[in-house]
C-alpha cells in the first residue's frame, strides 16, 4: 500500500530539491571560477625607499601603507593633491609617535601631548580643502606598552617601527573646511 502525500508536501519537497540543485550548481561554478582565476603573486617584501609607492587604488578610493619615517599628514596631503581627491573619509591603524591635541576653548588652540612608540588602535578622520590645500582632520586612540589608552585630536603622526595602514574612501563632492567664528576652530562645511 502506498501512502498518499498532500499536494503542498510534494511541492515543498520539489522546491527543496530545486534549491539544493541550484546551490550545488552555484558552488560548482564558484569552485571552477576559483580554479581558473589566477592568484596574485607578490614580490618579496623589501625595505621601503623614497621611490616605494605609498598607496594603491581600490574600488572605493585608496589603501595607503606608510613605513618607518613617513609622516601621515604629509603622505595624505601628497595623495589628495596627486589624485585630485575632492574629499574623503579615512580610517587606519599603525605604530609610531603621535602628538595628540585637546581643544582649549579659552585659548582657541590645542593643548598638545606627544606619545612615543604607541600602537594606534584606531584612527578616523576626513580629507577636505582649505585655501586650496588639503586639510586633514584625524582623531585616534593609542595604546602604550602598559596597555594604557590615550586619545584625541591628532596633530601629528610619524610612523616608527612597523607600518601604518590607512583606508581612504573618496567622496564625489569637494568639501571645504573653514574657521567657525563662534568657536574659533576649523569646521567641515557640508
Q: Where are each of the predicted segments found?
A:
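N-terminal intrinsically disordered, cationic/polar leader segments
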Residues: 35-63, 67-70, 74-83, 87-91, ...
Amino acid at each position: 500500500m502506498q501512502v498518499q502525500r498532500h499536494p503542498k508536501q510534494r511541492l515543498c519537497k520539489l522546491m527543496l530539491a530545486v534549491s539544493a540543485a541550484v546551490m550545488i550548481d552555484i558552488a560548482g561554478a564558484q569552485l571552477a571560477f576559483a580554479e581558473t582565476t589566477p592568484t596574485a603573486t607578490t614580490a618579496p617584501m623589501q625595505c621601503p625607499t623614497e621611490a616605494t609607492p605609498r598607496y594603491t587604488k581600490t574600488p572605493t578610493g585608496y589603501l595607503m601603507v606608510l613605513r618607518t619615517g613617513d609622516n601621515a599628514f604629509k603622505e595624505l596631503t601628497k595623495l589628495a593633491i596627486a589624485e585630485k581627491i575632492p574629499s574623503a573619509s579615512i580610517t587606519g591603524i599603525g605604530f609610531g609617535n603621535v602628538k595628540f591635541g585637546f581643544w582649549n576653548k579659552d585659548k582657541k588652540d590645542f593643548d598638545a601631548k606627544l606619545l612615543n612608540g604607541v600602537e594606534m588602535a584606531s584612527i578616523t578622520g576626513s580629507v577636505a580643502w582649505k585655501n586650496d590645500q588639503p586639510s586633514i582632520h584625524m582623531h585616534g586612540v593609542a595604546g602604550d606598552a602598559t596597555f594604557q589608552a590615550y586619545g584625541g585630536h591628532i596633530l601629528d603622526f610619524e610612523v616608527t617601527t612597523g607600518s601604518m595602514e590607512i583606508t581612504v574612501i573618496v567622496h564625489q563632492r569637494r568639501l571645504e573646511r573653514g574657521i567657525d567664528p563662534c568657536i574659533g576652530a576649523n569646521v567641515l562645511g557640508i
